């Protein structure tokens, strides 16, 4: 690890094989916490390359559990985090809207690492059992159309890295690896990233890893979501081709909002925000859920265009059925415990 650390601190890029080797040492706990934190920080300062991300992702996936579904018509819906926006859990909240609209969701997530609340924190606050085994997740998806794969359960080697990430408290390559290492190998994904420069990097990585349909997004405010404070950069993957465009809320009848309008808190606070949206609240928080849910509905194949998906998202929320989906999911996960 010292040799690889030296190379990175000198500004040199690692090969795919070297990156995989570094990831192996971090996950297995053969590198000391001091070396791991130094390596993660140095890699972030240098800037992670496509080869480094692919190498680390492949090693991480090789050590994790897996979920096998009978179809590939399902999505993962996740943000990298690390954007410093302190927003509520937008992608996790949006997954319930997608599921209520008929999209099968196999979501991969974790507890908060560089924010107050991660996907696990919100789902737990909504009453779900977040510690299902692979077979139980498969059953949950078959029964409810959605499932949650806890990174700490599926990537058990992460136990050696989790405390280090929490202690240094900054965005690292692990923020990128989570969305890329879905145990179900989802070929349809909506991924929010923390930097406009990383949008094209993610698109290249995902294309190389065989993702068929995806939207990789970053707001003009740096949010790892489709934002309501301005426009959002999108790289859409369509069968290996990458199409670049922007999403402007104004084009869908949605007014710009301030960042303060979409801030969140811990898991319990964010659960209350989600419930308010699902129970009919009209606000910037609802608007951002509409825009992000639409991405999942579109990539999940339930709409022929993003514009059509926005209308479906609005109708789904207004129907009142999303809260039923939350309760159904929570009950099923508890039954499987």
Functional labels for PLM-detected ranges:
Residues 1-2, 19, 36, 53, ...:
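A general structural signal for well-ordered alpha-helical segments in protein cores
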Residues 15, 32-33, 49, 91, ...:
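Helix N-cap / loop-to-helix initiation motif
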Residues 47-113:
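Active-site cofactor/substrate anionic-group-binding motifs, chiefly glycine-
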Residues 38, 54-57, 72, 136-140, ...:
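Beta-strand segments within the central parallel beta-sheet cores of soluble alpha/beta enzyme folds
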Residues 8-54, 62-69, 288-289:
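N-terminal glycine-rich anion-binding loops that anchor highly charged ligand groups
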Residues 1-13, 20-22, 77-83:
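N-terminal basic/disordered segments at the start of proteins
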């Amino acid at each position: 690890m010292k040799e690889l650390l030296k190379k990175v601190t000198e500004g040199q890029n690692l090969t795919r094989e070297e990156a995989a080797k570094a990831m192996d040492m971090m996950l297995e706990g053969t590198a000391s916490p001091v070396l791991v934190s130094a390596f993660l920080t140095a890699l972030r300062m240098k800037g992670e390359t496509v080869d480094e991300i692919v190498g680390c992702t492949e090693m991480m996936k090789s050590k994790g559990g897996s979920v096998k579904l009978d179809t590939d018509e399902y999505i993962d819906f996740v943000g990298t985090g690390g954007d410093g926006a302190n927003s509520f859990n937008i992608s996790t909240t949006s997954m319930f809207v997608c599921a209520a609209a008929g999209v099968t969701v196999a979501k991969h997530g974790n507890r908060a690492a560089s924010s107050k609340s991660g996907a696990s924190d919100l789902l737990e606050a909504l009453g779900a059992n977040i510690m299902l085994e692979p077979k139980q997740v498969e059953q949950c998806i078959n029964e409810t159309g959605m499932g949650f794969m806890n990174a700490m359960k599926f990537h058990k080697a992460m136990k050696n890295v989790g405390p280090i990430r929490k202690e240094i408290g900054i965005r690292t390559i692990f923020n990128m690896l989570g969305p890329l290492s879905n145990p179900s190998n989802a070929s349809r994904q909506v991924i929010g990233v923390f930097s406009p420069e990383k949008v094209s990097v993610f698109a290249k990585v995902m294309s190389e890893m065989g993702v068929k349909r995806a939207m990789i997004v970053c707001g003009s405010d740096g949010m790892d979501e489709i934002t309501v404070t301005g426009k959002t950069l999108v790289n859409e993957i369509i069968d290996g081709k990458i199409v670049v465009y922007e999403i402007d809320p104004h084009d869908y009848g949605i007014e710009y909002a301030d960042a303060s309008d979409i801030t969140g808190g811990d898991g319990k606070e964010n659960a209350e925000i989600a419930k308010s949206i699902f129970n009919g609240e009209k606000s910037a928080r609802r608007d951002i859920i509409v825009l992000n849910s639409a991405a999942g509905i579109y990539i999940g194949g339930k709409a022929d265009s993003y514009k059509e998906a926005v209308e479906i998202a609005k109708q789904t929320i207004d129907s009142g059925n999303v809260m039923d989906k939350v309760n159904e999911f929570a009950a099923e996960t508890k039954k499987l415990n």
